[in-house]
Amino acid sequence: MAMGTTVVHVTHEAVGKIGGIGAVLQGFFTCPSYLKIADRSILVGPLFTTEGSVQERLGPDGEVLYSSVDGLLPSGYRVAFERIERYYNVGIVYGRRTFTDTETGVSSSPEVLLIDVRHSDRGPVNDFKRRMYEEFGIQSQRYEHLWEYEQYVRLGPPAIAALKALGTPNESTIVVSHEFMGMPTALEAILDPNSDFRTVF
């Protein structure tokens, strides 16, 4: 990776450590060699709940900068996200989380992008499923009754649209799928005709 590289981590552990991926992320974001070559890091995942206050959305070490689900709509971010939210019928939470290695003192604050996909418009979702079938042979009708599958398919298109709105649509951006949950977003990154993302699984 060269300087100026943005690394997007698509994961179900964007906000809290649940299992192994959380430990991996903690290691990345407090590792000097990673921080030296990754100019920008963004965590992407679904918003699992709208319960609680806006201050709790990104966990105890998080700072929420924008949250349409809570009515926190600063103009700079609203311009970037409003069209995406209307088109896909999703909510967006955006901010930062701080990761610290208590032994070394190394810390960093990657961006966090969460998307509430519970009420997604069916049109764009079905179009994405069609494109996944045509290009990759993925038969979503076999799995879409499983929310564990469906929510991550719904995440893909608005996540890539939001990343583009945040200024990351070029070859210096790497979309990393952590486990199967990130695959639909990585596939949308490949399918998007106006982007030049690189992808890793």
For the regions a protein language model found, what residue spans apply to each?
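A short, glycine/small-residue-rich beta-strand->loop->alpha-helix junction that serves as a flexible
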Residues: 12-26, 54
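Conserved nucleotide-sugar donor-interacting segment of glycosyltransferase catalytic cores
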Residues: 151-201
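Nucleotide-activated donor-dependent transferases that construct or modify glycoconjugates
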Residues: 2-18, 45-47, 71-77
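A conserved catalytic-core segment of Leloir-type glycosyltransferases
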Residues: 43-170
